Swiss-Prot record:
It comes from Pan paniscus (Pygmy chimpanzee). Interacts with INCA1; the interaction inhibits INCA1 activity and induces the cell cycle process. This is Zinc finger protein 16. One of its GO terms (cellular component) is nucleus. One of its GO terms (biological process) is cell division. Residues 332-364, 464-494 are annotated as: Required for nuclear localization. Residues 1-42 are annotated as: Disordered. Keywords: Acetylation, Activator, Cell cycle, Cell division, DNA-binding, Isopeptide bond, Metal-binding, Mitogen, Nucleus, Repeat, Transcription, Transcription regulation, Ubl conjugation, Zinc, Zinc-finger. It is found in: Nucleus. The gene is ZNF16.
Length: 673
């Protein structure tokens, strides 16, 4: 093999030989100008039909009629030979390091394909010895550039022209749809002849690579390796942004692209600031409290919280702020400006964050989920409040009584108990309330609105709490049980009131007479004795009553209804209390005993009346004559003397009496007759 120096001298001699100037432009005959013919691989590789000359130049498997066999010197260079050529070319000079032509293809082509077929001007063709050997000297490579510029050879994949330089090589590395080297087995095509040579060693359909796990066949070893990673579960490629791992590097690259497409940035500085959010590095530390930040701007904003200075002051009310952005938002309160408008319903907001939160009411989006119970919320603040249900945290404490609350709104409402503040006033009757919800419920008295409807019977209620109590009638549920006697109740309030029977606790006292009650409702009813209020009136006779239950019982006199019947004797009563009292006649039960004399009574009212005998008290006084009585019933009978009322008539003779006992005695006269 001739030495490198000898070849360089031969090239220089060729350049100095007399003849036409090598820089004279000559008409270039391109391969694409040759007549086109079809070949078996044209459909598979997707390239247009080629001429015989082009086919032989780019496809070593194609044979012309006069070239039946391929000789050894026409074969493609092995990769080892190419590597050796590259190493030898790199040793020539540092001045020509960037001009090394990686794959010398001209010398690898069939003898019938000359430089003329590649469009090289006759004056710029390489010496025959160099074109056959495939070695290029710097001087010879200079022939291929020259004053014509680096546009003498075409890249097969593009219309642009390049010289034999890194420009052509870089172009040939770009993936393209056109691969001018069709593979005659399977119709595959390749961009470079070296790729085709490497492909010839890939297993064919006759000798595939088979996965031992699933039996799937592959045509390449890399595909088989990736398939085996799927079976082993190995995930060696981790995403730096989200921490997710992947078994293939290509999938990881796609993942990186998805992160980059999620957020767009105006410049490199914005992108760098954004990347600091993913990094755990926080180099900016507050000297006051030690809190660290990833950005210097965030630190500066935070440091203003330690400063008492509030340089941004509102011209309307004088309120000061540490940040100008907070002042701008505040000023919208005075101006009424609401620049952020919902595209769905048209509702406007002063802050963009409020619009984002509001928009979730239309979309139903609830991105904040509780890790304990899975309940989802549309706002992070609502999630934090909810999580206190699980933790039991009650950070807000009343300064007056020490009672803690999980929400600051509940503390504010509670504090009005101590201050007596009632800021919510009814515009119809002037009644004031401490809570807005109480005012809303109260207004339903005036409007008659009953929005809460029972889905079983259709009955409507003004309050949801009353509906819940009503629904227990249908279910029969009594979840509240007394721990002392085992009695069950449908409502917790009823259980609390019942427990006062065992404890003797009567926290509700009358301010007029000092009488105490176990229930607040009983105190309210009792106070009507002092006020004389009787708001419930009978529509039949006009009689009024202090309690609604008493009116209902009275109306049974007019309609004759006696729904409460004794299962022993069949006697019916218009009141359940009268039935209970009557049943003690059959049982002989007298649970109420006088502590003074030991006498027993079936009714508590009878015991109370009896105890007055021992005390000598006469609380019932006649307003006409001033006479006092120990029992209310005796006073009523006495008052008939003054009024002349005789409600008890004899059915036999029609005589009337003021007392029932006198009527009974009179009726004995008729029975004797």
């Amino acid at each position: 093999m001739p030495s490198l120096r000898t070849r360089r001298e031969e090239a220089e001699m060729e350049l100095s030989a007399p003849g036409p100037s090598p820089w004279t432009p000559a008409p270039q005959a391109r391969v694409s100008d040759a007549p086109a013919v079809t070949h078996p691989g044209s459909a598979a590789c997707g390239t247009p039909c080629c001429s015989d000359t082009e086919l032989e130049a780019i496809c070593p498997h194609y044979q012309q009629p006069d070239c039946d066999t391929r000789t050894e010197d026409k074969e493609f260079l092995h990769k080892e030979d190419i590597h050796e050529d590259l190493e030898s070319q790199a040793e020539i000079s540092e001045n020509y390091a960037g001009d090394v032509f990686q794959v010398p293809k001209l010398g690898d082509l069939c003898d019938d394909v000359s430089e003329r077929d590649w469009g090289v001007p006759e004056g710029r063709r390489l010496p025959q010895s160099l074109s056959q050997e495939g070695d290029f000297t710097p001087a010879a490579m200079g022939l291929l550039r020259g004053p014509l510029g680096e546009k003498d050879l075409d890249c097969n994949g593009f219309d642009s022209c390049f010289s034999l330089s890194p420009n052509l090589m870089a172009c040939q590395e770009i993936p393209t749809e056109e691969r001018p080297h069709p593979y005659d087995m399977g119709g595959q095509s390749f961009q470079h002849s070296v790729d085709l040579t490497g492909h010839e060693g890939v297993p064919t359909a006759e000798s595939p690579l088979i996965c031992n796990e699933c039996g799937k066949t592959f045509r390449g070893n890399p595909d088989l390796i990736q398939r085996q990673i799927v079976h082993t579960g190995e995930a060696s490629f981790m995403c730096d942004d989200c921490g997710k791992t992947f078994s293939q590097n290509s999938v990881l690259k796609n993942r990186h692209x998805s992160h980059m497409s999620e957020k767009a940035f105006r410049g490199h500085s914005d992108f760098s600031r954004h990347q600091s959010h993913h990094s755990s590095e926080r180099p900016y530390t507050c000297t006051e409290c030690g809190k660290a930040f990833s950005q210097n701007s965030s630190l500066k904003k935070h440091q203003k919280s330690h400063m008492s200075e509030k340089p941004y002051e509102c011209n309307e009310c004088g309120k000061a702020f540490r940040r100008s952005s907070n002042l701008i938002q505040h000023q919208r309160i005075h101006s009424g400006e609401k620049p952020y408008v919902c595209s769905e319903c048209g509702k406007a907001f002063r802050r963009s964050s409020n619009l984002i939160k509001h928009h979730r009411t239309h979309t139903g989006e609830k991105p904040f989920e509780c890790g304990e119970c899975g309940k989802a919320f549309s706002q992070s603040a609502h999630l934090r409040k909810h999580q206190r249900v699980h933790t039991g945290e009650k950070p807000y404490e009343c300064n007056d009584c020490g009672k803690p609350f999980s929400r600051v709104s509940n503390l504010i409402k509670h504090h009005r108990v101590h201050t007596g503040e009632k800021p919510y006033k009814c515009s119809d009757c002037g009644k004031a309330f401490s809570q807005s919800s109480s005012l809303i419920q109260h207004r339903r008295i005036h409007t008659g609105e009953k929005p809460h409807v029972c889905n079983v019977c259709g009955k409507a209620f003004s309050y949801s709490s009353v509906l819940r109590k009503h629904q227990i009638i249908h279910t029969g549920e009594k979840p509240y049980r007394c721990s002392v006697c085992g009695k069950a109740f449908s409502h917790s309030s009823a259980l609390i009131q019942h427990q006062g029977v065992h404890t003797g606790d009567k926290p509700y006292a009358c301010h007029e007479c000092g009488k105490t009650f176990g229930r607040s409702s009983n105190l309210i009813l009792h106070q009507r004795v002092h006020t004389g209020e009787k708001p419930y009136e009978c529509t039949e006779c006009g009689k009024t009553f202090s309690q609604s239950s008493t009116l209902i019982q009275h109306q049974r006199i007019h309609n004759g209804l006696k729904p409460h019947e004794c299962n022993q004797c069949g006697k019916a009563f218009n009141r359940s209390s009268n039935l209970i009292h009557h049943q003690k006649v059959h049982t002989g039960e007298k649970p109420y005993t006088c502590v003074e004399c030991g006498k027993g009574f079936s009714q508590s009212s009878h015991l109370i009346q009896h105890q007055i005998i021992h005390t000598g008290e006469r609380p019932y006084k006649c307003s006409e004559c001033g006479k006092a009585f120990s029992q209310r019933s005796v006073l009523i009978q006495h008052q008939r003397i003054h009024t002349g009322v005789k409600p008890y008539d004899c059915a036999a003779c029609g005589k009337a009496f003021s007392q029932r006992s006198k009527l009974i005695k009179h009726q004995l006269i008729h029975t004797r007759e």
